């Protein structure tokens, strides 16, 4: 399966601020086993479900070719919808191709 043009990571504004000046993006506890990423049409739904207490979220666009690790397109356990998960890797700032603030 070819790589998508972009994948997206959703961060809280606080997480985004905390990683400024660092070599990689900040990750949350939910990213311990693998890093959760999204396709464009999944961003709003994921933000509403998992970031409902945040009035705004930061959506970071990433070039998947610049992500170290294994990018896997798979369903969450017990689910049917496919998501991108990055195993054995991290999100370097060098992979960031765009950033936008989205009202949630």
Each model region followed by its residue ranges:
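Conserved, structured core segments of small domains
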Residues: 2-104
């Amino acid at each position: 399966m070819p790589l998508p043009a972009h994948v997206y990571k959703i961060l809280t504004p606080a997480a985004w601020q905390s990683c400024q000046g660092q070599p990689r993006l900040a990750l949350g506890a939910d990213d311990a086993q693998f890093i959760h990423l999204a396709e464009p049409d999944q961003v709003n739904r994921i933000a509403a479900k998992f970031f409902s207490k945040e009035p705004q979220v930061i959506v970071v666009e990433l070039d998947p070719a610049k992500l170290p690790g294994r990018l896997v397109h798979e369903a969450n356990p017990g689910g049917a919808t496919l998501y991108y998960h990055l195993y054995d890797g991290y999100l370097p700032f060098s992979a960031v191709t765009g950033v936008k603030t989205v009202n949630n």
